[in-house]
């Protein structure tokens, strides 16, 4: 064990001498209070340490003790419903242990509860051959999630002993006979946060991640195992969009990282989620959620740790064959922490003062998303989707964090402050957003909704783009100067914007929209477009289109229950539009 001495302190950065024999990214205990830190730079005898706790009051001459291990997380039953800080310290347990609403410095509480007993049900027998990643048993962790206990990476052999009953996470549940002797398996594993967890093979992202949000699913779809960025200026709805994703996404587990954002936003999640029902299981949303709270007033160095802690927890659930959504709000705050520490290290600054390695750090994080064949002898697939919010100052998408993120992710949901001011939510700008997964996921949509899904989607997108081109002319000379066909396009584009793209996050029906309902809503609007064009071509007055009563039905369809809408309302509306538009023809 290396024991050094502090010689310099600069905010969260501490320099210690006498650290020969230490390793990069080794966790150290700093000062008399034993603050947690991580070595980020080594010279022959000196180590530069980023400290994950407040450094006020520590002084040169105090000791620095190496632990010999990298920054790691504890993985096992007890993570769901938990709330951690950036280095996986359980906030509720710290409050109980210290009887304080603040985190005392140097506090050391285990990440997983050591006194809770979990009912372990074995799924293998003595004598069975097992590989790393094999499931040896299960624990019913919450009402929603059955936690699968895996053979740790690096252990292959034969089951020598397997137990059944109630155990804590530290008690042995299995003994595996390997070539290097017997290995004891507990329900808890430790894993270094900076090292991606291995898998057999990465699979192509061809299944859409259904979010229930029409603009995201239909127009800018994200695939399971994909990565997406949500950049937007302040007040444009990044956090509400991420809350909606956490509530409604077609995943088994949600890891929500509050990385340097306001404490009130984390409070909102903690207060809302225990009362909300999960659409898939009918249980509470909190039962499938892991919260990592690293708010703006916490030490900046821990922002980087919180991102890596979150993705490692997500990969662990992925290895069980589950689907995981990781939302990070906001990666800009992590980048700002990197900039601050880089400045204190006196490194050469890159663009706008960010370190030169900004893009490689972002890439390391986003590249850990993916749909994989999990380790183990059986065929098991899991995925991690990453949705990172970006907060560009002044909504400038050309700044380094946004531009580097866009090089890495394939889905870009651009939030627009102008749309938010017009009360258009979700405020995702359909002209600047894009998804590069559309060709990959189109097959799923065609198979599960309708063969013409891609045609309808592309036509609708074309109408919205055409409307943007016509707006300049309309502002100069008014809509009456346009040809009849283009007046129809303006009317249908308005219907698409107001009745399809807008969605009420607080309405019990409209908050979530299924793929079939999305497809049928789009089909109704595009059928109205084609029939309106026919009517106008046969002499109908385009000004009278806005007076037909079927338009009111179209405006109300998002509030209709799905079954009633698809079975009865869609045929009724198509029949009604035929008769009403037919009556307009002279």
Swiss-Prot record:
Chief location: membrane
- Give the record's membrane topology: Peripheral membrane protein
Q: Which residues form a coiled coil?
A: none
Presence of keyword Cell membrane:
yes
| Subcellular location field | Cell membrane
Record GO biological process: proton motive force-driven plasma membrane ATP synthesis
GO molecular function terms attached to this record: ATP binding; proton-transporting ATP synthase activity, rotational mechanism; proton-transporting ATPase activity, rotational mechanism
Q: Where does ATP bind?
A: 232-239
The protein's job, in short, is: Component of the A-type ATP synthase that produces ATP from ADP in the presence of a proton gradient across the membrane. The A chain is the catalytic subunit.
Family per UniProt?
Belongs to the ATPase alpha/beta chains family.
Q: Which HAMAP family match?
A: ATP_synth_A_arch (MF_00309)
From the Swiss-Prot or TrEMBL record, give the protein name.
A-type ATP synthase subunit A
What organism is listed for this UniProt entry?
Answer: Methanococcus vannielii (strain ATCC 35089 / DSM 1224 / JCM 13029 / OCM 148 / SB)
């Amino acid at each position: 064990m290396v024991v050094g001495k502090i010689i310099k302190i600069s905010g969260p950065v501490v320099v210690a001498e006498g650290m020969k024999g230490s390793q990069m990214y080794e966790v150290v205990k700093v000062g008399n209070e034993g603050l947690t830190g991580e070595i980020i730079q080594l010279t022959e005898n000196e180590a530069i340490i980023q400290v994950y706790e407040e450094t006020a009051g520590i002084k040169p001459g105090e000791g620095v003790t190496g632990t010999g291990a990298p920054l790691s997380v504890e993985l096992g039953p007890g993570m769901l419903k938990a709330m951690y800080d950036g280095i996986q310290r359980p906030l509720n347990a710290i409050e109980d242990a210290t009887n304080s609403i603040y985190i005392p410095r140097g506090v050391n509480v285990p990440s997983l509860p050591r006194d809770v007993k979990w009912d372990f049900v074995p799924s293998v027998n003595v004598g069975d051959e097992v590989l790393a990643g094999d499931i040896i048993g299960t624990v019913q962790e919450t009402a929603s999630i059955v936690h699968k206990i895996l053979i740790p990476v690096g252990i292959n052999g034969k089951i020598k002993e397997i137990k059944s009953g109630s155990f804590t996470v530290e008690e042995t549940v299995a003994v595996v006979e390997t070539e290097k002797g017997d290995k004891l398996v507990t329900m808890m594993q430790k894993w270094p946060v900076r090292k991606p967890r291995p898998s057999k093979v990465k699979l192509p992202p061809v299944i859409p991640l259904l979010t229930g949000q029409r603009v995201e699913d239909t127009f800018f779809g994200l695939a399971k195992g994909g990565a997406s960025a949500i950049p937007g200026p302040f007040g444009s709805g990044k956090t509400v969009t991420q809350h909606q994703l956490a509530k409604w996404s077609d995943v088994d587990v949600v890891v929500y990282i509050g990385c340097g954002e306001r404490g009130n936003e984390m409070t909102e999640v903690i207060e809302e989620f225990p009362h909300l029902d999960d659409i898939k299981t009918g249980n509470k949303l909190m039962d499938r959620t892991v919260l990592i709270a690293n708010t703006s007033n916490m030490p900046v160095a821990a922002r980087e740790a919180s991102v890596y802690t979150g993705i490692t927890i997500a990969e662990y659930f992925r290895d069980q064959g589950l689907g995981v959504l990781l939302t990070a709000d906001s990666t800009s705050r992590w980048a700002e922490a990197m900039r601050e520490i880089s400045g204190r290290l006196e490194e050469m600054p890159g663009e706008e003062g960010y370190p030169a390695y900004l893009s490689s750090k972002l890439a390391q994080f986003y590249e850990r998303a993916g749909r994989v064949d999990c380790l183990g002898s059986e065929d098991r697939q899991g995925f991690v989707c990453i949705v990172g919010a970006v907060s560009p100052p002044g909504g400038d998408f050309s700044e380094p964090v946004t531009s580097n993120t866009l090089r890495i992710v394939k889905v870009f949901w651009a939030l627009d402050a102008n749309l938010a001011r017009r009360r258009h939510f979700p405020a995702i700008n359909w002209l600047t957003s894009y998804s590069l997964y559309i060709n990959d996921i189109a097959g799923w949509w065609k198979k599960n909704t309708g063969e013409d899904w891609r045609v309808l989607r592309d036509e609708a997108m074309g109408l919205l783009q055409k409307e943007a081109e016509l707006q300049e002319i309309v502002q100069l000379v008014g809509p009456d100067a346009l040809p009849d066909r283009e007046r129809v396009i303006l009317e249908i584009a308005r219907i698409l914007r107001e009745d399809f793209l807008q969605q009420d996050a607080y309405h019990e029906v409209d908050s979530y929209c299924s793929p079939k309902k999305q497809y049928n809503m789009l089909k109704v609007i595009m059928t109205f477009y084609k029939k309106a064009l026919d009517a106008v071509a046969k002499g109908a007055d385009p000004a009278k289109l806005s007076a037909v009563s079927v338009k009111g039905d179209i405006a109300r369809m998002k509030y209709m229950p799905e079954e009633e809408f698809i079975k009865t309302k869609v045929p009724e509306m198509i029949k009604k539009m035929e008769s009403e538009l037919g009556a307009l023809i002279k």
